[in-house]
Amino acid sequence: MLYIIRHGKTDMNAKMLMQGRSDQPLNDAGIGQAEEAASRFAAMGIEIDKVYSSPLGRAVRTAEIIAPHSERVIDGRLIEMDYGPYEGMDLRDPAPEVMDFFEDFVNVPAPDGMEPLSDVVARMGSFLEDIRREAAEKNILISTHAIAMKGALEYLTPDSHGSYWAKNIGNCDIYAAEVKDGKYTVPVILDDGRER
């Protein structure tokens, strides 16, 4: 079984700043979110066998809190989208070209200097193919970031037509997918009724 989680909250998240490759630590709220996610897994009887994490500290720490005794592997393909010159931009007052992109991810290309969404999907897809057999036999947790996670969900749902790009994925939201007959199932949000 495959579980994909977005890292817990950071100060940049709280300040509504565009956070891509900036290596920000979890804040107290983010640590609490990761602890809550660990409790959710425990309450559902899910034991994580292995963790794959983005190299950024917020994703690594989220994974450590959720699965402290599981094998952990860092994979650079799980890093967040490269926002280039827009890194750190205030999302309450984005540049016009970024606003156009955010309003229509499917038809408007990423602004110059920003990683194209097709590249995010390609690297996440490459990673998912590499662990497919392992995910059929073990409970695998992927600790990553919002846009990288959306790239994985887009890859796993070929007929989504870009619907995940506009979907809000909150800190420590979890999606799950199985491997059946050698293929990934469509991912579903792991929702135990908690308030969002």
What are these model-derived regions, one by one?
Residues 187-196:
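Acidic, His/Gly-rich catalytic cores of divalent-metal-dependent hydrolytic chemistry
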Residues 66-125, 166:
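Phosphate-handling substructures
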Residues 5, 9-70:
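Active-site-proximal alpha-helix that buttresses catalytic centers in soluble enzyme cores
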Residues 2-3, 138-147:
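Generic beta-sheet signal
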Residues 11, 58-60, 80-81, 148-150:
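Short, active-site-adjacent cap segments at secondary-structure transitions
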Residues 53-54, 122, 143-144:
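Short beta-strand scaffold positions
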Residues 160-185:
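Domain-level recognition of soluble alpha/beta enzyme cores
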Residues 44-47, 131-138:
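Glycine-rich phosphate-binding loop signature in dinucleotide/nucleotide-binding domains
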